[in-house]
Swiss-Prot record:
The keyword Ribosomal protein does not apply. Pfam families: RNA_pol_Rpb6 (PF01192). GO terms for cellular component: DNA-directed RNA polymerase complex. One of its GO terms (biological process) is DNA-templated transcription. It catalyses: RNA(n) + a ribonucleoside 5'-triphosphate = RNA(n+1) + diphosphate. It is an enzyme of class 2 (transferase). PANTHER family: DNA-DIRECTED RNA POLYMERASE SUBUNIT OMEGA (PTHR34476:SF1). This is DNA-directed RNA polymerase subunit omega. Belongs to the RNA polymerase subunit omega family. Coiled coil: none annotated.
Length: 131
């Protein structure tokens, strides 16, 4: 496929705006180092993303889930409710003396100088030709 147009992808993702969101998210993933599923053919990341969608090497549903997950700031974890009564009954049986060590947890403290020295010691990431 020499040129990828929206018409090549519109039968995979019906809404053009959703297609733009998914393709741009995939292009960002490629820029961050994700493996591409097709030959690059000297194309830029947005074109590669559109070609992946058009060739159906990626599922639009999976891309949509990845996009939603990347935009979420707080992810709720569903925990089974059956475990809650057991935990509550164990807490009632546990004396307060056993709970005290949790309050004595100490966190490492770092001075500003140590923080700056650590930042200066960081190695910048390697340049990537995908841009």
């Amino acid at each position: 496929m020499a040129r990828v147009t929206v018409e090549d992808c519109i039968d995979k993702v019906e809404n053009r705006f959703d297609l733009v969101l998914l393709a741009s998210h995939r292009a960002r993933q490629i820029s961050q180092g994700e493996q591409i599923t097709i030959d690059r053919d000297n194309d830029k990341n947005p074109v590669v993303a559109l070609r992946e969608i058009a060739d159906e090497t990626l599922s639009p549903g999976d891309l949509k889930e990845a996009l939603i997950h990347s935009l979420q700031k707080h992810v709720e974890v569903d925990e089974p409710e059956a475990d809650l009564p057991q935990i509550a009954s164990q807490a009632e049986e546990t004396p307060d003396a056993e709970l005290a060590p949790e309050e004595n947890i100490a966190f490492d403290r770092m001075s500003e100088e140590e923080l700056l020295a650590g930042i200066e010691g960081l190695v910048p990431p390697e340049k990537n030709d995908d841009f």
